[in-house]
Amino acid sequence: MKIAAFDIGGTALKMGVMARDGRLLETARQSINDSDGDRILQAMLSWLAAHPSCEGIAISAPGYIDPHSGLITMGGAIRRFDNFAMKSWLETRTGLPVSVENDANCVLLAERWQGKAAEMANFLVLTIGTGIGGAIFCQHQLINGARFRAGEFGYMLTDRPGGRDPRRYSMNENCTLRVLRHRYAQHIGAPLDSVTGELIFDRYDAGDPVCQRLVAEFFNGLGHGLYNLVHIFDPQTIFIGGGVVERPGFLTLLRQHLAWFGIADYLDTVSHGNDAGLIGAVYHFNQLYRSPDDDRH
């Protein structure tokens, strides 16, 4: 059985054709401007039309998501997905079974299914992207929360609020590549689109003093949040995900900056890089549509 898998991000849509055992058979990526939800939906339908052999749809998406009904009550940066019944919408248009799960939860499920957490009972995932995402695995169970909001680590404060809006002092506003890029672009007077995370870390490695300061602030904010998570959940490991972790030497750099917090040994990176969301989405599909006589999934 082939599954069409989609990993929806704030700036890109990753698409795949996957076997039910998690093997990736084909992938593609499409840039998404301005978190355009309608464009995302059309791209998904086009991918499905081009791959008629797929018999199911597995989706990793941002926001607060009921993993059973597929209702997205808040779509993160994609406002089109607020209060959107994505599962029903796609099933009506395709006639295929559909599963929808939060993106960070999918990264966690991939790590548990086919990664370094296969034998772990307690671990966390923290993803660094347009925002900070998170997922919790406690006593052999994925924790969704009463309103499907568990793991929203990005709302943790990294400093004492000094203004009216505490969100300005959250991890989302201080520990993401989006914020890092924005701050460096402002400093050098360049358009945001011309400044990438890769550029900043390259200049950090080259000794650029501004990049050295900004990257240190970035890791310091992460350190505050990760320190709190270690002492709240007592995890075996916190796995860090997101495109930035694929940079050579990132884990070593992360551990160096966070050594002061005394938590470096708790940290690792996810096993599947940018494919983690697709793999975890298929795992969730398997769980939702598990047949009684099929224990492989």
From Swiss-Prot:
Belongs to the ROK (NagC/XylR) family. CDD domains: ASKHA_NBD_ROK_FnNanK-like. It catalyses: D-cellobiose + ATP = 6-phospho-beta-D-glucosyl-(1->4)-D-glucose + ADP + H(+). The lineage of its organism: Bacteria, Pseudomonadati, Pseudomonadota, Gammaproteobacteria, Enterobacterales. Its EC number is 2.7.1.85. Changing G133A: Loss of catalytic activity. The gene is bglK. This is Beta-glucoside kinase. Homotetramer. Catalyzes the ATP-dependent phosphorylation of a wide variety of beta-D-glucosides, to produce 6-phospho-beta-D-glucosides including cellobiose-6'-P, gentiobiose-6'-P, cellobiitol-6-P, salicin-6-P, and arbutin-6-P. Is not able to phosphorylate alpha-D-glucosides. May have a dual role of kinase and transcriptional regulator of the cellobiose-PTS operon. The keyword Nucleotide-binding applies. It is an enzyme of class 2 (transferase). GO terms for molecular function: ATP binding; beta-glucoside kinase activity. Coiled coil: none annotated. Is inhibited by N-ethylmaleimide in vitro, but ATP affords considerable protection against the inhibitor. Keywords: ATP-binding, Carbohydrate metabolism, Kinase, Nucleotide-binding, Transferase. ATP binds at A5, F6, D7, I8, G9, G10, T11. InterPro entries: ATPase_NBD (IPR043129), ROK (IPR000600), ROK_beta-glucoside_kinase (IPR053583). Induction: Highly induced by cellobiose. To a lesser extent, is also induced by gentiobiose, cellobiitol, and methyl-beta-glucoside, but not by arbutin, salicin, esculin or phenyl-beta-glucoside.
